[in-house]
């Protein structure tokens, strides 16, 4: 038995879990939020204990140091050498990283080379990788790429209708994201439905503050809604999703915005927040909608309508759908969103059992329907730990 740590570093946060492997038991988990601020929050839970501290944490490097200190101070581990592997979620791997890999100096350079494609995420991922390699030099470090699962998408689905040379020379194409989550829930759904993954046509809806839909055939991604960056596809918490590209020069040339202002608007002021004018959080939108707020209702109709557009297109492309999956914060916890989506898909044979949906059952479709509608809680950290386990076993055997 050995210990594997899974790390998910965001732009101002660091999510962590330690698993004992190969049993996949969670030893400790937690979240460090508001990194860079004087009132950063350190949360950690283990063995029925919960720790919450508010303190200054200036950067991700300091966050890692504090985390390792706390693990020892609370005797979650006695020595850092007990951690044999650390897995890092990396948002964007470009075309060079088609699977998880052991981190080397060359791998770090490769991740840095595509930082401009995920400027909010990759820099934090890199800092986490470098700090853990420095503080845990004997643990194997593994990079797990959000884009890797989508490397099976065929060329006709990942190319943009731009001059082909832009792909050949500059690798401008659809990459897709949330791959670790989509891969996990597809495998879990196969277990729940007691069917071989290789024989299933699955449409996975990862719906959180970031959101994407993925078509999965025989366990492989064949299309997904996000694109060159995580801004494409569905409208999201603060992201616009896909828009007519000529809106951008119009905003610059006719309305006087700078390009930086437009990009900030599209990534931080649009989506659910921009349309509703209320919040980027769907919980707030649902409350406002129930109170009759017209823009909150409009936001819900837009969001669920866009989801259904992708589901319909992917079901058509795969010539069917065996399972429709809802996962992530909104997908797992919003009966209203699930109901609004499934109500628009009756032509596919999709149903939603009201009682099962409201109770959050794992299978919420009617029993006799061919298309199984499932709520599958995602577990990206476990997927990361499993990938690390493959490499860590080689070093400790």
Curated annotation (Swiss-Prot):
* Annotated catalysed reactions: acetate + ATP = acetyl phosphate + ADP
Cofactors demanded by this protein? Mg(2+); Mn(2+)
EC class (word): transferase
Return the CDD domains for the record: ASKHA_NBD_AcK_PK
Which residues does the annotation say bind Mg(2+)? 8, 380
Domain of life (superkingdom) = Bacteria
Q: Which UniProt keywords apply?
A: ATP-binding, Cytoplasm, Kinase, Magnesium, Metal-binding, Nucleotide-binding, Transferase
Catalytic machinery residues: 146
Any idea which GO molecular function terms this record carries? Answer: acetate kinase activity; ATP binding; magnesium ion binding
Question: Which GO biological process categories is it annotated with?
Answer: acetate metabolic process; acetyl-CoA biosynthetic process
Give the pathway.
Metabolic intermediate biosynthesis; acetyl-CoA biosynthesis; acetyl-CoA from acetate: step 1/2
Site Transition state stabilizer — annotated at: 178, 239
- Report the protein's function: Catalyzes the formation of acetyl phosphate from acetate and ATP. Can also catalyze the reverse reaction.
Belongs to which family? Belongs to the acetokinase family.
Report quaternary structure and partners.
Homodimer.
Under NCBIfam families, the record lists: ackA
Instruction: Please report the name of this protein according to its UniProt entry.
Output: Acetate kinase 1
What gene is this protein a product of? ackA1
